[in-house]
Each structure stands twice: as structure tokens, then as C-alpha cells.
């Protein structure tokens, strides 16, 4: 049995199948950990969703910002944006089944010495607190309040956490941290303007995982979202978004020995 963590797929179904072939994946024996952003921008989100559902318990995934965007569009809360490739999912005969499956995925997964999350964790969150906060928002996503909340889900404020936050502000901070964050101030305030390489992070900001006092630093965080960061491996960090949808590559790391597997994502 092996566990393969895989970076942002974004509708790249063919490359996903190529990666499974490369690693010799066996659904009766092995497990896949997916960092989220399963859908959108790529050519075949519909087939990818269907394949993941067919794989059943072999798949553990967390929601990314594009996955939440699909759910918000499907709820009628927001319109599609330029570059979205979600229409085939929305028009599919089994659309309700696909969306219901997606809606019931996690924001945060903690197992043994690993955490799986799409973007990151705020520095003042312990693993235990992050788990509780994620479950709080998962309840919203799966319930009747999501349609209303999703209209304002992605505002940039508040930009930091404090325990007094309530309602939509509270849920927005949790979602922003777990699905959108890349950098913070040294005090833990999120900044969403920086999307480039590590070398381009401006003075006064740090990658969220380099905040010295980060409460989760002793746990290995597996994440994606930051394609300009690319494959980034440190003792307690596995970053996996290598820009498949931008014709980079699709990356998997086998957690047991950190062996790296990659397939090029050139479009034909």
C-alpha cells in the first residue's frame, strides 16, 4: 500500500490518467491524496469528476478555490468568469450527483503526521484548531446557508484571524486561508496580491509556511495552489502545484519515501 499526493489537476483528466499509469496505481491497494482545484481552466473537468467518484475510498481530497467557485456558480450565487471551463459539468445529466459529491469533500484532512490542505494554514492555528474551523465551514458548504454565503465568499477582509470573528467574516477568513493564501505579514495578516515565485515576495511579507512562530510547523503540510512556487520539498512541507493546466507538469509525491513522479502537460 502506498499513498500518492497529487498536485492541482484543474480538469486535466488525460494527464491524471497518465500519472496513474506512471505510478502503477492500484485502487484496491493504494491511496490518492489530492490537494484540491480538481476542476476549471483545464479541458475535461467532467470526466475527471466522474473518474474520481469511481475510485471511491481510494481518493482523499480537499477543496480548492476553483472547486468552491464551481459550487457557487451551480448555486446561482455568482456568474462564471472569463476562462472558466465549467459548463460541461453544469449541463451534464449527472450534474447533481457530481456537485453533491464535491460538496461533501473536506477543506482539511489530518492523518498521522500529515495535513492535506489546498493553500495553507494561518500561523496562529494549531492543527487541532484548524480541524475544528474546517469542519465548521464544511457544515456551511453542505447546508442551506451556502447559497447566501457564497455571494460574498471571496472578499479579502478580514485579513487575519481572531477568535471573536463571527458569521460570514469568520467563514471567509477560514476559506481564504485554506484555499487562497500564499503570503502573510510577519504578524499573520494575509496578502493576496503576491502570486509569483518565492524570489518575488516583497519585503514585509513571507510565505505562510516561513512564519517563524507558525503553530503547525512540526506537522508535514501537503498543499498546492501556488503554481509559481512549484515543487517544494522541505522536512515538513510538500508543495505540489507544478502548473499542469499552464502546460507545466502534473506531480505526485509518494509519501512513504518522497519519491517524485511527474508527467508533462503539453496539450495536443
From Swiss-Prot:
Its EC number is 3.6.1.41. Keywords: Hydrolase. This is Bis(5'-nucleosyl)-tetraphosphatase, symmetrical. HAMAP family: ApaH. It holds the Pfam family Metallophos. Hydrolyzes diadenosine 5',5'''-P1,P4-tetraphosphate to yield ADP. One of its GO terms (molecular function) is bis(5'-nucleosyl)-tetraphosphatase (symmetrical) activity. It catalyses: P(1),P(4)-bis(5'-adenosyl) tetraphosphate + H2O = 2 ADP + 2 H(+). It comes from the Bacteria. It is an enzyme of class 3 (hydrolase). Belongs to the Ap4A hydrolase family. CDD domains: MPP_ApaH. InterPro entries: ApaH, Calcineurin-like_PHP_ApaH, Metallo-depent_PP-like.
Amino acid at each position: 500500500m502506498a499513498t500518492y499526493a497529487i498536485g492541482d489537476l484543474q480538469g486535466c483528466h488525460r494527464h491524471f490518467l497518465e500519472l496513474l499509469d506512471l505510478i502503477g496505481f492500484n485502487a484496491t491497494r493504494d491511496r490518492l491524496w489530492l490537494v484540491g482545484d480538481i476542476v476549471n481552466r483545464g479541458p475535461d473537468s467532467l470526466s475527471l469528476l466522474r473518474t474520481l467518484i469511481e475510485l471511491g475510498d481510494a481518493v482523499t481530497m480537499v477543496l480548492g478555490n476553483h472547486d468552491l467557485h464551481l459550487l457557487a456558480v451551480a448555486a446561482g450565487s455568482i456568474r462564471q468568469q472569463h476562462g472558466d471551463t465549467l459548463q460541461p459539468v453544469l449541463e451534464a445529466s449527472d450534474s447533481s450527483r457530481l456537485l453533491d459529491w464535491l460538496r461533501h469533500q473536506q477543506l482539511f484532512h489530518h492523518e498521522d503526521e500529515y495535513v492535506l490542505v489546498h493553500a495553507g494554514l494561518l500561523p496562529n492555528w494549531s492543527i487541532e484548531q484548524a480541524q475544528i474551523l474546517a469542519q465548521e465551514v464544511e457544515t456551511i458548504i453542505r447546508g442551506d446557508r451556502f447559497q447566501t454565503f457564497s455571494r460574498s465568499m471571496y472578499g479579502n477582509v478580514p485579513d487575519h484571524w481572531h477568535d471573536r470573528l463571527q458569521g460570514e467574516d469568520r467563514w471567509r477568513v477560514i476559506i481564504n486561508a485554506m484555499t487562497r493564501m500564499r503570503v502573510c505579514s510577519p504578524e499573520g495578516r494575509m496578502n493576496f496580491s503576491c502570486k509569483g515565485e518565492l524570489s518575488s515576495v516583497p519585503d514585509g511579507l513571507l510565505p505562510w509556511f516561513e512564519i517563524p512562530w507558525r503553530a503547525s510547523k512540526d506537522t508535514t503540510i501537503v498543499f498546492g495552489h501556488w503554481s509559481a512556487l512549484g515543487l517544494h520539498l522541505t522536512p515538513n512541507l510538500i508543495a505540489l502545484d507544478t502548473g499542469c493546466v499552464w502546460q507545466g507538469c502534473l506531480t505526485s509525491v509518494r509519501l512513504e519515501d518522497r519519491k517524485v513522479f511527474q508527467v508533462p502537460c503539453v496539450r495536443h
